[in-house]
Amino acid sequence: AAELAALAIEFDAKLAVVGDEACLPELRAALAGSGVVAAGGRAALVEAAARPVDMTVAAIVGCAGLAPVMAAVERGGTIALANKEALVSAGEVLMQAVARHGATLLPTDSEHNAIFQCLSGNRIEDVAKITLTASGGPLRTWSAER
């Protein structure tokens, strides 16, 4: 909460939200007198993501980040997606919502961004195969055959 408060103050944020409501008292104390509003919990995350802003950075770990990402998409905004789980768990639904609401999804997760950069300026029809390497995750110990 202290790090979030410091960033909120540094970047003149209007609102700082923690997902874990147990951290809210610490966040409020760290933001006291700053003018930054503190909020906590799942509903606060979704409400924050639905606000009209220039860009939403979605970096909540795991599937917990899906509801805020969908709220930002439904607003029709630009979302810098640093959470690959939203795509893994609900990619088809998410991409349909992006198209329906005119949202823009920018990949900021390292692997997704690497593909995005490689494809930039190329026609997708000209790409036959993409090989994605990874530095970790649950498949890191699997053989290539598996």
Regions from the language model: what does each represent?
Residues 18, 37-41, 57-58, 80-82, ...:
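General beta-strand structural signal in soluble alpha/beta enzymes
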Residues 41-44, 109-117:
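Short, glycine/charge-rich beta-strand/loop segments that flank catalytic centers
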Residues 21, 85, 111:
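Residue-level "edge-of-site" marker
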Residues 12-13, 33-34, 51-55, 74-77, ...:
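Short coil/turn connectors at secondary-structure junctions
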Residues 49-51, 67-70, 91-92, 118, ...:
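Short, conserved acidic/polar surface loops in the N-terminal third of protein domains
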Residues 104, 112-146:
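Conserved anion/nucleotide-ligand pocket segment
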Residues 1-63:
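N-terminal glycine-/serine-/threonine-rich beta1-alpha1-beta2 phosphate-ribose binding loop
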Residues 24-33, 42-46, 59-75, 83-104:
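Rossmann-fold NAD(P)-binding glycine/threonine-rich loop
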